[in-house]
Amino acid sequence: MAKKPVKDLKQLGHATPVPASPEEATLERVPNPHPDANYVARFTVPEFTSLCPVTGQPDFAHLVIDYVPGKWLIESKSLKLYLQSFRNHGAFHEDCTLAIGKRLAGTLAPKWLRIGGYWYPRGGIPIDVFWQKGKLPAGVWVPDQGVAPYRGRG
């Protein structure tokens, strides 16, 4: 891949503080070197954190983001910083999960994208949130997200 796209990045290779909020975070993208191929790129985030908008208590989730790129790939440092910006952000589980999926879809215009948000129990109830954009191209292999259903002590 050409070096020019890397040169244009503002976060990769630079000391970059965690943004104060998801709205302030910058998601960067790079050209997909294989836009003609249908393949899945996966990001697994086992320690995602946000805040309950009512109590201010921390909420934790295991996120799995799968997408079939079009012309663009997400630059992973910018994704990491974006996700870390939720650490002090108050929002319900559904809002966090869909906000991430929609922001990625808007930035990348992928052929297909899905996000699974597997939220750890609060008040004894785990909440799993799933969102998908687009139709999966034929013939693309997408592995199971690999997150076991919550069983507690049952």
Swiss-Prot record:
Biased composition (Basic and acidic residues): 1-11
GO biological process, one term: tRNA modification
SUPFAM superfamilies in the record: Tetrahydrobiopterin biosynthesis enzymes-like
GO terms assigned for molecular function: preQ1 synthase activity
Residues the record lists as binding substrate: 74-76, 93-94
Pathway: tRNA modification; tRNA-queuosine biosynthesis
Stretch forming the signal peptide: none
Region feature (Disordered): 1-31
Compartmental location: Cytoplasm
Protein name in the entry: NADPH-dependent 7-cyano-7-deazaguanine reductase
Organism phylogeny: Bacteria, Pseudomonadati, Pseudomonadota, Alphaproteobacteria, Hyphomicrobiales
